[in-house]
Swiss-Prot record:
GO biological process: peptide biosynthetic process
Entry keyword set: Cytoplasm, Elongation factor, Protein biosynthesis
Gene name linked to the record: efp
GO function terms (MF aspect): translation elongation factor activity
UniProt similarity note: Belongs to the elongation factor P family.
Any one Pfam family match given in the protein's UniProt record, by short name: EFP_N
Organism whose genome encodes this protein: Rhodospirillum rubrum (strain ATCC 11170 / ATH 1.1.1 / DSM 467 / LMG 4362 / NCIMB 8255 / S1)
Pathway where it operates: Protein biosynthesis; polypeptide chain elongation
Protein name listed in UniProt: Elongation factor P
Keyword Cytoplasm in record: yes
Length: 187
């Protein structure tokens, strides 16, 4: 299925140069001069090799048709991350490198969809947002309120995110799983 490059999301499976690739990370780059483009970090489904590609936002790419399975994340162990198919109750593991940075967002009992090609799992699609707790936040420096200023915050999963100055350690926030950015304070 053809789609525009600006619709690429982590976890999707693309066909590029005759190979199947899982999207690990995306970044929209808007240079001062010229059109915007998408930088995509991908992993080859078969060999595990990684590559980086750049596409203009209007370019079209081929997204592979995959079978999506509704699953529940169970736990992490030496073999990788273990999921359970919600229909058949079968359990299977995926290696940490297959998930990339998405692994940091997994929480026990989280509902996810797993993409399978020819019966083998290749990627995980997370919810677009997760609620995480801020465990460490820098203090606000007085006088920095003239413009919107953000400060670095450390989340319970070990990831860092830029948060507004009113967020303190212990606060639960909503974080985007697409680009690891602060959305709002959790209600």
């Amino acid at each position: 299925m053809k789609m525009q490059a600006n619709q690429i999301r982590p976890g999707q499976v693309l066909e590029h140069q005759g190979k199947r690739w899982t999207v690990l990370k995306i970044q929209l780059i808007q240079p001062g001069k010229g059109g915007a483009f998408i930088a995509v970090e991908m992993r080859d489904v078969d060999s595990g090799n990684k590559t980086n590609e750049r596409w203009r936002t209007a370019d079209t790419v081929e997204r592979l048709e995959v079978r999506e399975i509704d699953c529940q994340y169970l736990f992490k162990d030496d073999t990788g991350y273990t999921f359970m198919d919600k229909e058949t109750f079968e359990q299977f593991s995926m290696a940490a490198d297959a998930l990339g940075e998405q692994a940091g967002f997994l929480q026990e009992s989280m509902e996810v969809t797993v993409d399978c090609i020819e019966g083998s799992p290749v990627s995980v699609n997370l919810p677009s947002q997760v609620i995480l707790q801020v465990v460490e936040a820098d203090a606000v420096v007085k006088g920095q309120t003239a413009s919107s200023s953000y400060k670095p915050g450390l989340l319970e999963n070990g990831m860092k995110v830029m948060i507004p100055p009113f967020i303190e350690a212990g606060t639960r926030i909503v974080v985007s799983t697409v680009d690891c950015s602060y959305i709002e304070r959790a209600k």
